Design a protein with these regions (language model features):
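Conserved donor NDP-sugar-binding/catalytic core segment of glycosyltransferases
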Residues: 94-130
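Glycine-rich, basic loop-to-helix element that forms the pyrophosphate-binding segment
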Residues: 58-74
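Short, well-formed alpha-helical segments that are part of the catalytic scaffolds
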Residues: 7-27
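Conserved nucleotide-sugar donor-binding
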Residues: 157-168
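Short beta-strand/loop segment that forms part of the nucleotide-sugar
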Residues: 22, 30-39, 55-57
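Short beta-strand-to-loop acidic/aromatic patch adjacent to the donor-nucleotide binding site
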Residues: 79-90
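Short, flexible, basic/aromatic active-site loop/helix in glycosyltransferases
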Residues: 133-153
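A conserved acidic beta->alpha catalytic loop
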Residues: 36-44, 59, 89-90
Length: 168
């Protein structure tokens, strides 16, 4: 069975939103590692959540360094995938299953994949975010002819993205 761990990085979080983030992930992954870049401890946010590892840093070391702490945690435990989520990202139902299915479809088609992710939707407008300069560049072609939901792109947002450990 595939093991998926989620890394959620905090920085002075809004507790209500962060609880929604954790709740949206809890049933979809095997464990959540919360790495806290805030100058104070926020362990109270995690009360009531099983399978959550809390790593308070008590200083801001940056999102990438904090994500690396979470990655190392799951590598050491032998996990197959890591899912990144921001403290305010609400994962839709079954999103992890869909990302795993897309990864598997690409692997079966012998397409090497570094990460699979979602399209970011603006909560206020309900519309996908559009490209700003060259931040997110999507190639307008479908990767597999038998699916219309996988699109090749040069980069993705880290939040709600799935990273495999073995390059495939």
């Amino acid at each position: 069975m595939v093991k998926v761990g989620a890394v959620v990085v905090l920085y002075n979080p809004n507790f209500d939103v962060t609880k929604k983030t954790l709740s949206s992930l809890a049933s979809q992954v095997d464990q959540i590692c919360v790495v806290d870049n805030s100058p104070s401890d926020h362990s109270e946010v995690l009360s009531g959540y099983e399978s959550v590892e809390y790593k308070p840093l008590l200083k801001n070391i940056g999102i990438a360094a904090a994500q690396n702490i979470g990655i190392r945690y799951f590598i050491d435990l032998g996990y197959d995938f890591v899912l990144f989520a921001d403290q305010d990202s609400i994962a839709s139902e079954k999103v992890v299953d869909k990302l795993l299915e897309n990864h598997q479809a690409l692997k079966e088609a012998s397409i090497k994949v570094g990460a699979v992710g979602t399209r970011a939707i603006n909560r206020q407008t309900g519309l996908p975010y559009v490209e700003k300069s060259n931040e997110i560049r999507i190639i307008d072609k479908r990767v597999l002819s038998n699916t219309s939901n996988i699109t090749e792109c040069y980069s993705i947002m880290s939040s709600i993205s799935l990273i495999p450990w073995k390059y495939s």
